[in-house]
């Protein structure tokens, strides 16, 4: 039953026993944000007039793609309609988490801010890989799990079948699985009651030194960085000076409060509360997700565990189509970094593409989202080079190189090359096992194990090199399984591999933008494919142009762009053969001279078409 604002406890004076912190975990598109909308309406924190679908997804790109990228936190008052706490107003802090594999670190920090989680599964599709990955994270954090089937209003829903699957997975009875429809609102009040009943209240020491964990931070152009925190011990008050424990930086709390869902200032926030703080800092990197905040006076000495710096896994070069946009691109990346602490970049130049940046991302969706935001919010036209991963190269003389750009791959005597590997989990209907295994074996995968979740759904676990996933692995997986498979992966370290750098030479000159690091067994196929593609794209010159793919000094593939022939004999009608020969010899001389000094210009669209389609990566794409 919605609580009236008059009896909602103040954030600084709420008894921790009345607080419930929970989050919702689900696969993309299983209705998480819609369920959040219904909760906002039911608890009465958002006025009916201002309600809109996916209320918590603020970014345009989140709304368009139907995904949640940034975590959001909302304080919901709720008085249970039944049970021993009937009529007593509780405070529910709901944290909406991203569902995508690239943002797993954000999810894990959000989970650490909760005591319970609502595991949401689509009643028409069942458990997917992402759900499993996030469920394991929740179990690692010892959260109480409330299983829920959503979309029971769909004609294709099979609540009985999937509630059994869910019950087997988390070890409860099928009748304990709640059935709701976030769209129509059926069963959502029962879900809120269950959260109050099952999720434990936060435990913390009210009079200990303050300790709060940052689980998200966003940049607001007017107020600077807004940091979302969960208070574990003690209390944070307005105008107090605080200290970040990982960096030792100190700030003054200009504003403190809770979001319900608009920001509502308060005097302070106490044990177990989830709220926001504003310190006037302008850079998100100073309030790092997972860091601990404490008071400057009588502060805590031990930080809360679990903080780590997000490490970029995938690198790509971003270049403006128009060289004069370079300063705008720098400014745009600076602004994006304010909001996205996981983004790293450094300037680089390419002989072929001019000035640009080498940008590091958490994964492919992150790359896609950043690129789209740059193009949409800042109006830039970009070329992105093919994504690549970070290699560690050990030379025979004992030196070590970390390579983020294929053109920096060292020449000379290499002892070992280490590449990152991931543990991938694929969930799919069992009829596609053969196709999935064939795809993974082709990508240098090693099978770890296989489990049947039910008689027709199987979970397959593989170790795969990250480099094999970053191109079109996901597209291939979807097309081989008619869209039914779902994929999740997590980094598990690195392995040594027989990798080589393939260079593309045009007329004997290396084109750095086309260099790629690939496995020795696939280097030949890669070279042949790229060379054949370039031959179609490079316009014919007045002299012939060899296009070669080479590993070191050894050429492995070659195509030739034929010269344009000018008919020099057009003006000779009949006449002496020696006259014609003289003209032909003269033409031959000229061609030879041109070939010596000639320069081959690669047209811009040739770059775009080679780099933007991932045909260079997977054999399957070229055959479509």
UniProtKB/Swiss-Prot annotation:
Instruction: List the keywords (alphabetical).
Output: Cell membrane, GTP-binding, Hydrolase, Membrane, Nucleotide-binding, Protein biosynthesis
> PROSITE patterns per the record?
G_TR_1, G_TR_2
The way it spans or sits in the membrane comes to: Peripheral membrane protein
The Gene Ontology biological process terms listed for this entry are: positive regulation of translation
Cysteine disulfide links:
none
Catalytic activities: GTP + H2O = GDP + phosphate + H(+)
Q: Which GO terms describe its cellular component?
A: plasma membrane
Please indicate which superkingdom the organism of origin belongs to.
Bacteria
> So what EC number does this one have?
3.6.5.n1
Q: What InterPro entries does this protein map onto?
A: EF-4 (IPR006297), EFG_III/V (IPR035647), EFG_V-like (IPR000640), EFTu-like_2 (IPR004161), G_TR_CS (IPR031157), LepA_C_sf (IPR038363), LepA_CTD (IPR013842), LepA_IV (IPR035654)
Q: Which CDD domains match?
A: EF4_II, EF4_III, LepA, lepA_C
GO molecular function terms noted in the UniProt entry: GTP binding; GTPase activity; ribosome binding; translation elongation factor activity
Q: Per UniProt, where does GTP bind?
A: 29-34, 150-153
Q: Where in this chain does the record put each tr-type G domain?
A: 17-203
Compartments where located? Cell membrane
The UniProt entry's sequence similarity note says:
Belongs to the TRAFAC class translation factor GTPase superfamily. Classic translation factor GTPase family. LepA subfamily.
Q: Which NCBIfam families match?
A: lepA, small_GTP
Q: What does this protein do?
A: Required for accurate and efficient protein synthesis under certain stress conditions. May act as a fidelity factor of the translation reaction, by catalyzing a one-codon backward translocation of tRNAs on improperly translocated ribosomes. Back-translocation proceeds from a post-translocation (POST) complex to a pre-translocation (PRE) complex, thus giving elongation factor G a second chance to translocate the tRNAs correctly. Binds to ribosomes in a GTP-dependent manner.
Matching HAMAP family, A to Z? LepA (MF_00071)
| Record's protein name | Elongation factor 4
Species this chain originates from: Streptomyces griseus subsp. griseus (strain JCM 4626 / CBS 651.72 / NBRC 13350 / KCC S-0626 / ISP 5235)
């Amino acid at each position: 039953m919605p609580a009236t604002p008059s009896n909602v406890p103040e954030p600084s004076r709420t008894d921790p026993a009345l607080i419930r912190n929970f989050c919702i975990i689900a696969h993309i598109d299983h209705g998480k944000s819609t369920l959040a909308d219904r909760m906002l309406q039911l608890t009465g924190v958002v006025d009916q007039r201002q309600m809109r679908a996916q209320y918590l997804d603020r970014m345009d790109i989140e709304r368009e793609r139907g995904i949640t990228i940034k975590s959001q936190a909302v304080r919901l008052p709720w008085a249970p309609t039944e049970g021993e706490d009937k009529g007593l107003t509780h405070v529910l802090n709901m944290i909406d988490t991203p569902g995508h594999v690239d943002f797993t670190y954000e999810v894990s920090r959000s989970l650490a801010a909760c005591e319970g989680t609502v595991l949401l599964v689509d009643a028409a599709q069942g458990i997917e890989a992402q759900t499993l990955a996030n469920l394991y994270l929740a179990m690692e954090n010892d959260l109480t799990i409330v299983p829920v089937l959503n979309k029971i209003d769909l004609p294709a829903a099979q609540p009985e079948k999937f509630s059994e699957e869910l019950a087997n997975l988390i070890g409860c009875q099928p009748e304990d699985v709640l059935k709701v429809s976030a769209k129509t609102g059926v069963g959502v009040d029962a879900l809120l009651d269950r959260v109050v009943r099952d999720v434990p209240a936060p435990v913390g020491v009210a009079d200990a030194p303050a300790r709060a964990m940052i689980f998200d931070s966003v940049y607001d152009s007017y107020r600077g960085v807004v940091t979302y925190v969960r208070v574990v011990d003690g209390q944070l008050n307005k105008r107090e000076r605080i200290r970040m424990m990982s960096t030792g930086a100190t700030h003054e709390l200009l504003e403190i409060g809770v979001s319900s869902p608009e920001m509502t200032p308060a005097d302070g926030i106490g044990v177990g509360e989830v709220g926001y703080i504003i310190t006037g800092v302008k850079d998100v990197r100073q309030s790092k997700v997972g860091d601990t905040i404490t008071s400057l006076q009588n502060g805590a000495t031990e930080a809360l565990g679990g903080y780590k710096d997000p490490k970029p896994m995938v690198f790509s070069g971003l270049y403006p189509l128009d060289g004069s946009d370079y300063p705008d691109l720098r400014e745009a990346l600076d602004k994006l970094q304010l909001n996205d602490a996981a983004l790293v970049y450094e300037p680089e130049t390419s002989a072929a593409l001019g000035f640009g940046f080498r940008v590091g991302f958490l994964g492919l969706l992150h790359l896609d989202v950043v690129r789209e935001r740059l193009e949409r919010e800042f109006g830039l036209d970009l070329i992105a080079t093919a994504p690549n991963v970070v290699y560690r190269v050990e030379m025979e003389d004992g030196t070590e190189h970390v390579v983020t750009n294929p053109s920096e791959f060292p020449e000379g005597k290499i002892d070992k090359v280490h590449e990152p590997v991931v543990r991938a989990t694929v969930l799919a209907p069992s009829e596609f096992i053969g196709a999935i295994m064939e795809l993974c074996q082709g990508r240098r995968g090693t099978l770890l194990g296989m489990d049947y979740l039910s008689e027709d759904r199987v979970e397959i676990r593989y170790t795969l090199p990250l480099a094999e996933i970053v191109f079109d692995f996901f597209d291939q997986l979807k097309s081989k399984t008619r869209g039914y498979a779902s994929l999740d992966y997590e980094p598990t370290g690195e392995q040594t591999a027989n990798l080589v750098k393939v260079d593309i030479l045009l007329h004997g000159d290396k084109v750095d933008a086309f260099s790629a690091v690939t496995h020795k067994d696939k280097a030949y196929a890669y070279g042949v494919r790229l060379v054949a593609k370039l031959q179609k794209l490079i316009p014919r010159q007045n002299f012939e142009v060899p296009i070669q793919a080479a590993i070191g000094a050894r050429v492995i593939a070659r195509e030739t762009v034929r010269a344009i022939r000018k008919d020099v004999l057009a003006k000779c009608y009949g006449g002496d053969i020696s006259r014609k020969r003289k003209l032909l010899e003269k033409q031959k001389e000229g061609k030879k001279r041109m070939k010596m000094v000639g320069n081959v210009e690669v047209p811009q669209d040739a770059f775009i078409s080679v780099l933007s389609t991932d045909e260079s990566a997977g054999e399957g794409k070229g055959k479509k």
